[in-house]
């Protein structure tokens, strides 16, 4: 790696992100380490996302029909246009937490064996974002964690260990372009990032996690999205890692903690606090329903699990673009 001046391409798949895309692009352009190019794959936006992107000379826009979008293949398409030594993947409704996001991603490439570095998502303090998820750092001490296994070692890991090692997130991740060419994302309706992490590890590469490489990213979820996201995530984690998870349970103490967090959020009115308490209650119930259907289907065998996944998640979960308390 050319530490003095690495070349970096950014790839962003988007659709109808007019409300947030400028914050995303401006955040990238304000980084302490500049990028070579920003490649945006737009899959049929019907708002003015594309028009806003045309204001930036550094942005290359590739337009595809919405029916051609796929979580894995669309990202591969973006990578095929990239010229940088490194490729960052993010999304149009995310923005860097600070101007050292790229620097912190690069910091993980201190070993030639590292194929990619992943950061974390955090939720910005805003009354339209779930206050239970607001980023409240307790400890500023962070460290880079690396995973590397032989194929035999990886296969001997428990499902929990596999899930932990592959908790990849391409909302905030940097890759060696050469590795993405060697190991592209699979065609899949969901979890393309976690599957890629497994493929990279099985191929003998090292992957790294740096919690200092943060982006702001948040989805206002309705019950249908939470249910589908829960079910499809469990499905793919089981298929690739053998992970079954545990049925979520909310204790009285858990409810009291949520109530306390919301109650102590001074930025919210009493009406807003009530809204967010009900919101979290509804999302927990939707998540629990996803777990229940997964568990019940799995007890009847893989065929039933595949059938239930097609039934409920044949159309992948799509997050809401609006996050209005009035909803």
Predicted regions and their residues:
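Non-catalytic, C-terminal membrane-associated alpha-helical segments of glycosyltransferases
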Residues: 229-235, 239, 246-327
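Conserved donor NDP-sugar-binding/catalytic core segment of glycosyltransferases
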Residues: 95, 99-135
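A recurrent flexible, glycine/aromatic-enriched loop bordering the glycosyltransferase active site
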Residues: 151-175
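Short aromatic/hydrophobic "clamp" motif used to bind/position activated sugar donors
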Residues: 87
């Amino acid at each position: 790696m050319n530490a003095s001046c690495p070349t970096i391409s950014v790839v962003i798949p988007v659709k109808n992100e007019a409300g947030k895309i400028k914050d995303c692009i401006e955040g990238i352009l304000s980084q302490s380490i500049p990028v070579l190019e920003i490649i945006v794959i737009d899959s049929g936006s019907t708002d003015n996302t594309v028009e806003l992107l045309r204001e930036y000379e550094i942005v290359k826009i590739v337009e595809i029909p919405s029916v051609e979008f796929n979580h894995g293949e669309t990202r591969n398409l973006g990578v095929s246009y990239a010229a940088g030594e490194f490729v960052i993947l993010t999304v149009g409704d995310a923005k860097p937490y600070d101007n050292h996001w790229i620097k912190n991603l690069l910091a993980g490439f201190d070993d030639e064996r590292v194929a990619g570095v992943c950061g974390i998502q955090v939720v910005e303090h805003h009354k339209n974002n779930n206050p239970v998820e607001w980023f409240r750092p307790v400890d500023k001490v962070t460290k880079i964690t690396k995973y590397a296994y032989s194929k035999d070692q990886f296969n001997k890991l428990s499902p929990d260990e596999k899930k932990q090692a592959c908790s990849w997130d391409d909302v905030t991740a940097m890759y060696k372009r050469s590795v993405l060419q060697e190991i592209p994302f699979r065609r899949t309706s969901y979890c393309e990032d976690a599957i890629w992490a497994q493929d990279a590890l099985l191929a003998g590469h090292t992957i790294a996690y740096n919690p200092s490489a943060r982006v702001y990213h948040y989805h206002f979820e309705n019950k249908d999205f939470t249910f589908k996201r829960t079910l499809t995530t469990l499905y793919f984690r089981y298929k690739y890692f053998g992970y079954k998870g545990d049925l979520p349970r909310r204790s009285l103490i858990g409810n009291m903690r949520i109530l306390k967090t919301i109650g102590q959020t001074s930025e919210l009115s009493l009406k807003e606090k009530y809204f967010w308490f009900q919101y979290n209650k509804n999302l927990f119930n939707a998540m629990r329903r996803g777990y229940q259907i997964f568990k019940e289907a799995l007890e009847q065998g893989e065929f039933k699990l595949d059938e239930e996944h097609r039934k409920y998640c044949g159309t992948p979960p799509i997050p809401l673009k609006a996050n209005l308390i009035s909803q």
